[in-house]
């Protein structure tokens, strides 16, 4: 994660994307999270901080825990004395591995991208246009570094008249006598350096003097015919680059084991640098105070007494010195010769590439394996450099892995500097390796303040021979490399797939910078075992032997290549020339600091000192970043490590400020880091706030393709439906969710046509427009009191911090997503008071800037005077330097005037805003008073209503009480009445029981009678049934007889009719009259028919009567059965039980009902008997 969600004050977050700028209150894009893997991150702030940022609260806790638990005397690891190095040359790179030395190894993980400030874009401020984009890495430990298998190119070295004007490699103090480069007896005589295309190395030594790189240029003649690379760091022609100082004696050094790199074949077209130029560039500052008299490191050992005496420091070890055989006149002649050869060749394709800073660009050197021995034979001095051959568009950084690991601290081979000069197409990714070639990355920075040292670097051979290199244990240097910034510790001695460096020493040995007024007398008589000196004394010795580390970077992975952090055991260190010395301490303060020790050196504060009472001293931005980036889980011996980064001189910084007005945005982080430093314990190297005028902020401009890829990742994250457009509503919700305040302005930039959707082109164009617009935001918020704290008197420091605290109160609330514990009115009051105090301090900036302008002029004059006194070899350039300084001072004054005008405008705006806020506050006060009056009136009305309701409630309660009493009285009277009735009913119970017994006796008698009658009835019914059966049988028999008789009668009638007819016929034949006979016959026939009809009707009547009788009998049977069921025993028992259980009234009612039923039954029986008597009396007869 290269960009982290940043708060407005930026106290606890880093922002290290190659193009973005430090976010503030004015930046509405602070909520966007751009991931290097082209993915948008929308995680919560806590998760983001855990993975990609530094938690200042944990840092503050971790930085104090060890000191508080262990007291003032913190124990740090001791380094055991090691035997003198062997003088045997090893033929192979790994032949010396068997000679192990007891010590600690720190394993570094360089695969992850750590947050850094080294990749910020600034405009190119050097004398050339559009220098190559490069990667800045730093190390403070002596590392013997061997490059991987890189392509070889032979560049042409050039320089300019401004070779030393832009670098100002000057030793300000007269006690820093010379810079001698020692020679090794085993060094071969031929060595050459080659400047590669597309890479760079900045020499820098943490805790030592920052060497401003010398500007040179080289032409790539082999790998890419495109451009000539303009570089500002000349090849250092020294195996042991040593800035001698009489302050401290030298300590013994020890050999380091390095691996021998595999070198590809040498290109025939490569050009070499003449050996005489190497010798001509060897400087010798002053012959009166040479360090050649110091004993050789091969004949000395570490003093165990010092190791035992004080555990807070580790003894300083330096490389053996050698006499320089190059005279100052010869060096001066060489400088003139080089100045006439300077050329500037740039290709149009490289125009879009930006230089990282105005004083630092890349230098690289390459050497083929086949030509190595021949060139080493002529080499007397060399410096080990390792370069990164990667995509310059990806800022030339590679995620490296260790393929060959050196054993702890012993070596038998001298480092060999092989630098790849292959230029890569900026539009492509890093080139893959071929034939097992490996790409290695490391750096050996050597930095010296331009105000304090002159360091001439040779343009000749820079390749080291394969010989014993001397490693040192230094209390003032730290081995830095790339490591995971998430806080994971790698155990000592454990080998990973990354760079392995020797362990670092205690933090108490961090070196402070010198002020322009410090005097550095010789300290040969100082007590090095004293606590103040050993823990806090400034050491001015520089050594650059390095441990050979060969790393391999991952192919085709530019996302993992830009890691500008270097670290030792979780000690994050910003590299790449981001920070330099802050020489803004006043003369009186310098004098006070000089008087604290015998050697006139500044002494760091102890636990008992209050940070707010300290005299502001020099500080660089890298140290503050180190304070804010130390992982809390790191061991106490590796906490609070501050690197000294490469610094910009005054002229370069002024040019930087003119060409890049956005630099103050980067300076805002310095303010926040100063605030964070207040929370650290004094034992953990308390530091004074930084003077932004002298804080160099250098960054690299990200390539356009990387910017587009990062923006596309954000756009794809916002484009949820994947249609290539982002709706305005979704973007507004996303912006509000991450605290963006100027959402309307964002939508105005991103959707100028008002279509409601945002395409990627509009998104990219809008973000660019917003970035350009933000470059001119008010400096009243960035250039706060902490910007010029170094100019403020110590007693005013507390007020300045109070102002900063008020600013934090104004801005920290919502951005940290923490609910406020104060009321809104109190917060508004704090904001108004803080704004008034803040604007008051804005006016103070004007006077301070004027003092600052005068001070800058004095500093420049003093620096050039020091240069003229210490640089006899540069006599012919002194006038040019002074003229350049005058022009630069004039430019600075103009810049300061411009800033004063801007501050005045901002002050006027602040006054207007303050007046408006006062008016609003007055309106709010009136409104609050009116509301208070309304509240009082409402309270009075409420009290009156409450009293009225209380009275009503009391009256209602009294009424209810009276009603309850009356109801109780009524109920008592009713109860008394019921008791009387109950007593009466109880007295009636015996009588009723006697009546019940009498009635039961009568009931039993009736029951018996009914039983007798029923029995008789049953008998009669049985006899009747028998008789009915017999009757029906007889009737059936009679019917058959009747039918037979009827048939017989019919036959007889027929016969009679035949006879009558026959008679009539016979009479007719006899002559009688037939009419009378015929009439008689007809009459007789009619009578017969009528008789038959009468008989039939009678028979039918008889059958109907029989049916009627049967039905009557059935009715009588049913009636008898019903009456019998009424008088059964079960019914009588249930009736008695019911009589016992019911009341008197119910009993009387039941008796009346029963009597009615009996009456009805009696009437019904009587009617049945009457009907029987009328219809068939024979049924009732007793037989």
UniProtKB/Swiss-Prot annotation:
Compartments, as annotated in UniProt: Recycling endosome membrane; Cytoplasm, Cytoskeleton, Microtubule organizing center, Centrosome; Cleavage furrow; Midbody
Gene3D superfamilies per record: 1.20.5.2440, EF-hand
PROSITE patterns given in the database record: EF_HAND_2, FIP_RBD
Annotated binding of Ca(2+) 1, by residue: 719, 721, 723, 730
Pfam families the UniProt entry points to: EF-hand_7, Rab11-FIP3, RBD-FIP
Gene Ontology CC annotations of this record: centrosome; cleavage furrow; endocytic vesicle; endocytic vesicle membrane; endosome; Golgi membrane; midbody; recycling endosome
Biased composition (Basic and acidic residues): 431-441
Annotated keywords: Calcium, Cell cycle, Cell division, Coiled coil, Cytoplasm, Cytoskeleton, Endosome, Golgi apparatus, Membrane, Metal-binding, Repeat, Transport
Annotated coiled-coil segments of the chain: 902-1121
Sequence positions that bind Ca(2+) 2: 751, 753, 762
Top-level division of the source organism's lineage: Eukaryota
SUPFAM superfamilies: EF-hand (SSF47473), Eferin C-derminal domain-like (SSF144270)
Single GO BP term: protein localization to cilium
Region of interest: ARF-binding domain (ABD): 911-1015
Residue span, FIP-RBD domain: 1121-1183
Name of the protein described by the UniProt record: Rab11 family-interacting protein 3
Highest classification ranks of the organism: Eukaryota, Metazoa, Chordata, Craniata, Vertebrata
Gene name as annotated: rab11fip3
């Amino acid at each position: 994660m290269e960009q982290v969600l940043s708060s407005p004050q930026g106290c606890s977050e880093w922002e290290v994307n190659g193009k973005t700028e430090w976010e503030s209150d004015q930046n509405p894009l602070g909520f966007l999270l751009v991931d290097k893997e082209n993915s948008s991150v929308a995680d919560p702030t806590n998760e983001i901080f855990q993975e990609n940022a530094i938690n200042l609260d944990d840092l503050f806790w971790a930085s104090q825990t060890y000191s508080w638990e262990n007291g003032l005397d913190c124990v740090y690891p001791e380094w055991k004395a090691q035997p003198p190095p062997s003088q045997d040359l090893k033929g192979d790179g790994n032949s010396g591995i068997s000679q192990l030395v007891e010590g600690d190894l720190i394993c570094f993980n360089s695969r992850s991208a750590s947050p850094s400030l080294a990749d910020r874009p600034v405009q190119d401020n050097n004398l050339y246009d559009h220098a190559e984009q490069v990667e800045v890495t730093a190390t403070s430990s002596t590392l013997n570094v061997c490059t991987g298998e890189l392509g070889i190119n032979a560049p042409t070295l050039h320089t300019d008249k401004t070779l030393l004007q832009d670098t100002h490699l000057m030793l300000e103090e007269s006690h820093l006598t010379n810079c001698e480069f020692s020679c090794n007896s085993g060094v071969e005589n031929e060595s050459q350096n080659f400047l590669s295309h597309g890479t760079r190395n900045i020499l820098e030594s943490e805790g030592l003097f920052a060497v401003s790189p010398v500007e040179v240029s080289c032409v790539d003649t082999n790998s890419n015919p495109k451009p000539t690379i303009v570089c500002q760091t000349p090849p250092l022609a020294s195996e042991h680059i040593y800035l001698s100082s009489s302050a401290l004696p030298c300590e013994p050094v020890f050999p380091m084991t390095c691996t021998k790199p595999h070198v590809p074949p040498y290109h025939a077209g490569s050009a070499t640098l003449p050996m005489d130029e190497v010798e001509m560039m060897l400087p010798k500052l002053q012959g009166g105070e040479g360090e050649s008299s110091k004993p050789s490191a091969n004949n000395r050992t570490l003093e165990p007494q010092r190791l035992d005496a004080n555990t807070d420091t580790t003894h300083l070890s330096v490389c053996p010195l050698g006499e320089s055989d190059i005279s100052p006149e010869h060096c001066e002649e060489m400088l003139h010769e080089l100045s006439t050869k300077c050329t500037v060749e740039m290709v149009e394709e490289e125009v879009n590439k930006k230089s990282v800073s105005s004083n630092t660009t890349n230098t690289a050197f390459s050497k083929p394996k086949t030509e190595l021995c021949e060139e080493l034979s002529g080499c007397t001095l060399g410096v080990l450099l390792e370069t990164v051959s990667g995509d310059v568009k990806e800022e030339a950084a590679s995620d490296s892995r260790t393929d060959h690991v050196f054993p702890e601290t012993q070596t038998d081979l001298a480092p060999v500097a092989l630098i790849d000069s292959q230029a890569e197409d900026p539009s492509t990714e890093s080139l893959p390796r071929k034939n097992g070639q490996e790409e290695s990355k490391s750096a050996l920075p050597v930095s010296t303040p331009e105000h304090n040292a002159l360091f001439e670097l040779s343009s000749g051979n820079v390749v080291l021979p394969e010989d014993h290199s001397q490693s040192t244990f230094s209390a003032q240097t730290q081995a830095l490399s790339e490591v995971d910034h998430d806080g994971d510790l790698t155990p000592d001695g454990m080998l990973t797939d990354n760079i392995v460096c020797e362990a670092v020493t205690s933090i108490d040995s961090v070196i402070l910078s010198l002020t322009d007024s410090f005097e550095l007398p010789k300290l040969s008589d100082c007590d090095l075992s004293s606590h103040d000196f050993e823990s806090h004394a400034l050491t001015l010795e520089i050594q650059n032997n390095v441990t050979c580390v060969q790393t391999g970077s991952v192919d085709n992975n530019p996302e993992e290549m830009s890691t500008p952090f270097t670290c030792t055991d979780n000690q994050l260190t910003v590299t790449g020339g981001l920070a330099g010395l802050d020489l803004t301490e006043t003369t009186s303060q310098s004098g006070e600091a000089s008087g604290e020790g015998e050697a006139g050196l500044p002494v760091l504060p102890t636990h008992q000192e209050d940070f707010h009472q300290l005299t502001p001293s020099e500080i660089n931005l890298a140290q503050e970043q180190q304070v804010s980036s130390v992982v809390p889980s790191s061991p106490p011996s590796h906490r609070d490590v501050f690197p000294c980064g490469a610094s910009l001189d005054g002229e370069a910084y002024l040019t930087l400020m003119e060409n890049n007005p956005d630099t103050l945005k980067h300076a805002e982080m310095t303010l926040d880091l100063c605030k964070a430093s207040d929370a650290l314990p004094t034992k953990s190297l308390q530091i004074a706030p930084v003077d932004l005028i002298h804080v160099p902020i250098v960054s690299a401009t990200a390539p356009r393709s990387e910017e587009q890829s990062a923006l596309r990742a954000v756009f794809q994250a916002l484009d949820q439906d994947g249609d290539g457009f982002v709706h305005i509503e979704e973007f507004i919700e996303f912006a509000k969710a991450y605290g963006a305040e100027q959402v309307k302005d964002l939508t105005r930039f991103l959707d100028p046509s008002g279509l409601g959707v945002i395409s990627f082109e509009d998104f990219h164009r809008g973000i660019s427009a917003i970035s350009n617009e933000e470059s001119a935001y008010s400096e009243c918020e960035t250039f706060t009191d902490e910007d010029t704290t170094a100019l403020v008197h110590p007693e005013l420091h507390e007020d300045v911090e109070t102002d900063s605290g008020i600013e934090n109160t104004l801005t920290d609330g919502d951005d940290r997503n923490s609910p406020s514990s104060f009321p809104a009115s109190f917060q508004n009051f704090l904001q108004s008071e803080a704004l008034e105090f803040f604007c008051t301090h804005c006016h103070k900036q004007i006077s301070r800037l004027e003092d600052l302008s005068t001070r800058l002029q004095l500093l420049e004059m003093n620096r050039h005077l020091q240069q003229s006194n210490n640089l006899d070899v540069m006599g012919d350039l002194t006038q040019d330097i002074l003229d350049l300084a005058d022009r630069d001072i004039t430019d600075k004054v103009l810049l300061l005037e411009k800033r004063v005008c801007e501050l005045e405008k901002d002050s006027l705006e602040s006054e207007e805003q303050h007046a408006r806020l006062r008016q609003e506050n007055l309106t709010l006060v009136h409104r609050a008073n009116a509301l208070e009056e309304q509240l009082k009136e409402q309270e009075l009305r409420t009290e009156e209503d409450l009293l009225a309701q209380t009275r009503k409630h009391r009256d209602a309660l009294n009424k209810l009480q009276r009603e309850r009493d009356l109801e109780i009285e009524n109920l008592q009277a009713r109860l008394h009445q019921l008791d009387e009735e109950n007593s009466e009913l109880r007295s009636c119970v015996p009588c009723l029981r006697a009546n019940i017994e009498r009635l039961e006796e009568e009931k039993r008698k009736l029951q018996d009678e009914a039983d007798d009658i029923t029995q008789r009835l049953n008998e009669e019914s049985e006899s009747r049934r028998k008789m009915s059966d017999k009757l029906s049988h007889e009737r059936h028999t009679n019917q058959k007889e009747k039918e037979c008789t009827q048939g017989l009668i019919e036959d007889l009638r027929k016969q009679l009719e035949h006879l009558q007819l026959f008679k009539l016929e016979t009479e007719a034949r006899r002559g009688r009259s037939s009419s009378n006979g015929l009439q008689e016959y007809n009459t007789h026939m009619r009578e017969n028919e009528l008789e038959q009809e009468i008989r039939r009707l009678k028979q039918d009547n008889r059958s109907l009567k029989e049916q009627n009788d049967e039905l009557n009998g059935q009715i009588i049977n049913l009636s008898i059965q019903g009456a019998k069921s009424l008088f059964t025993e079960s019914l009588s028992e249930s009736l008695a039980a019911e009589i016992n259980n019911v009341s008197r009234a119910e009993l009387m009612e039941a008796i009346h009902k029963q009597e009615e039923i009996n009456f009805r039954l009696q009437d019904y029986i009587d009617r049945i008997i009457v009907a029987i008597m009328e219809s068939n009396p024979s049924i009732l007869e007793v037989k």
